[in-house]
């Protein structure tokens, strides 16, 4: 039994040049676990609180020294001597120490950093890769990558309202093959954009961010790139969207493509897209508080496409339960920093899967080289992962980790492929 001997934290930088928390946990057997905490650009209002310093004279107010101090001065003394394998008790001790419903005292970034670092240390102590430590012998499914290759919304400086246009290599036989297909489409998209005189500048998550006349224009460009790469849209590679609609929901209407639309009108728009394009997934199609609209949309097209609750559910089991009870949405986006601890994240995944909801392990737009979410995706047999374009090292780090896991699993590895999207009829 390895006990927690010491916990240290520091400020490091994320992929957007903003400070974030990194934590190291030292165990009595000499093993060390490390984890860095991601940060989002478009965040749900019900997410656990990311503690920032607010000192405008330092990192423009975005420093995280308060969270670092919380780890060193409060969390570390409270957890010293805990059995590192008792993850649930460790996480609960931090939640109790914080004492708020949204982790606003210590900060979700402080609690999560410790939670993930403990898991990494315990896995090292057990001489197991993290995915096997968390998932046991059943951890063998490699996720379909939802690769964000064209950016709009708050991830880019353009007139495109939808935040992420993604490709999903559903027809591949293995993860490595699916990743290769995605890379080839990504590079073909760059060539398509260049040929049309469009910008090939990159957004936060490595996708291209051209200024386009409409959201459909973005889908058309991606389909052209898929064909140019030698693949068939809908058969080999499908499309997916993250609308992030809460970002353009103002004064009771959706400010979309120059018009103020109702939830009913937005639902009709999505139904047309699903009919016209090989779409397997639409994330946050409506505002996080528009539960009535979400229910109407789910009833209308939920049998044809994956409807993903990100801002809607914020990886919170109690909010997800409301969705399950009302048959609202049919998929959960899993972001560890939305809820702020590993065990609460695993609880949300388990609840979703038991209810027949699909699950997607996800990065944030502000990322680091930490690869923990790749292991979580395999540990939970999530079937899908969102971790950006096949560009920028903080995104590629997760893909490379999944390649290593697939190689290690060898014949036991299974790629989720088309089975990850049971509602897709394409």
Swiss-Prot record:
SMART domains in the record: Enolase_C, Enolase_N
Cofactor mode of binding and number, as noted: Binds a second Mg(2+) ion via substrate during catalysis.
Residues annotated as transmembrane: none
CDD domains: enolase
Active site, per annotation: 205, 335
Keywords annotated in UniProt: Cytoplasm, Glycolysis, Lyase, Magnesium, Metal-binding, Secreted
GO cellular component: cell surface; extracellular region; phosphopyruvate hydratase complex
Keyword Secreted: yes
UniProt cross-references to InterPro entries, sorted A to Z: Enolase, Enolase-like_C_sf, Enolase-like_N, Enolase_C, Enolase_CS, Enolase_N
Primary residence: cytoplasm
Pathway it works in: Carbohydrate degradation; glycolysis; pyruvate from D-glyceraldehyde 3-phosphate: step 4/5
UniProt record, GO biological process: glycolytic process
EC number: 4.2.1.11
Cofactor: Mg(2+)
Subcellular location as annotated: Cytoplasm; Secreted; Cell surface
Substrates-to-products reaction catalysed: (2R)-2-phosphoglycerate = phosphoenolpyruvate + H2O
A GO term for molecular function: magnesium ion binding
Binding residue positions for (2R)-2-phosphoglycerate: 163, 335, 364-365, 386
Positions that bind Mg(2+): 242, 283, 310
Classification via HAMAP family: Enolase (MF_00318)
Stated role: Catalyzes the reversible conversion of 2-phosphoglycerate (2-PG) into phosphoenolpyruvate (PEP). It is essential for the degradation of carbohydrates via glycolysis.
Matching PANTHER family: ENOLASE (PTHR11902:SF1)
Record family assignment: Belongs to the enolase family.
Protein name (record): Enolase
């Amino acid at each position: 039994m390895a006990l927690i001997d010491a916990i240290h934290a520091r400020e490091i930088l994320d992929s957007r040049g903003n400070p974030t928390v990194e934590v190291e946990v030292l165990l009595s057997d000499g093993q060390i676990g490390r984890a860095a905490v991601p940060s989002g650009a478009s965040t749900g209002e019900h997410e656990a609180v990311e503690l920032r310093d607010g000192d405008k004279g330092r990192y423009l107010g975005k420093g995280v020294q308060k969270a670092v101090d919380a780890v060193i001065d409060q969390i570390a003394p409270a957890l010293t001597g805990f059995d590192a394998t008792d993850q649930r008790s460790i996480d609960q001790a931090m939640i109790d120490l914080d004492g708020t419903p949204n982790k606003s005292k210590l900060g979700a970034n402080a609690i999560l950093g410790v939670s993930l670092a403990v898991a990494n240390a315990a896995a090292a102590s057990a001489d197991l890769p993290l995915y096997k430590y968390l998932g046991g012998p059943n951890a063998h499914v490699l996720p379909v990558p939802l690769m964000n290759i064209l950016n709009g919304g708050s991830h880019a400086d353009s007139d495109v309202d939808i935040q992420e246009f993604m490709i999903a290599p559903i027809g591949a036989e293995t993860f490595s093959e699916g990743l290769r297909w995605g890379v080839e489409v990504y590079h073909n998209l760059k060539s398509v954009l260049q040929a049309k005189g469009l910008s090939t500048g990159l957004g936060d998550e490595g996708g291209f961010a051209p200024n386009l006349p409409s959201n459909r224009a973005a889908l058309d460009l991606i389909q052209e790139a898929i064909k140019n790469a030698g693949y068939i849209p809908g058969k080999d590679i499908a499309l997916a969207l993250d609308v992030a609609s809460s970002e353009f929901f103002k004064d009771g209407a959706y400010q979309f493509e120059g018009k103020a639309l109702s939830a009913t009108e937005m639902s009709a728009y999505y139904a047309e897209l699903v009919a016209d394009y090989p779409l397997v997934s639409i994330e946050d199609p409506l505002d996080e508080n528009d539960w009535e609209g979400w229910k109407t949309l789910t009833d209308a097209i939920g049998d044809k496409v994956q409807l993903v609750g990100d801002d809607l559910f914020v990886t919170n089991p109690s909010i997800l339960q409301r969705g399950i009870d009302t048959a609202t949405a049919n998929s959960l986006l899993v972001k560890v920093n939305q809820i702020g601890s590993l065990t609460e994240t695993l609880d949300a995944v388990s609840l979703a899967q038991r209810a027949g909801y699909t699950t997607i392990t996800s990065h944030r737009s502000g990322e680091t080289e930490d690869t923990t979410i790749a292991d979580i995706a395999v540990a939970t047999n999530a079937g899908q992962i969102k971790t950006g374009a096949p560009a920028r090292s903080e995104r590629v780090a997760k893909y490379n980790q999944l390649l290593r896991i697939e190689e290690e699993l060898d014949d036991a590895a299974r790629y989720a492929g088309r089975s990850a999207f049971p509602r897709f009829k394409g």
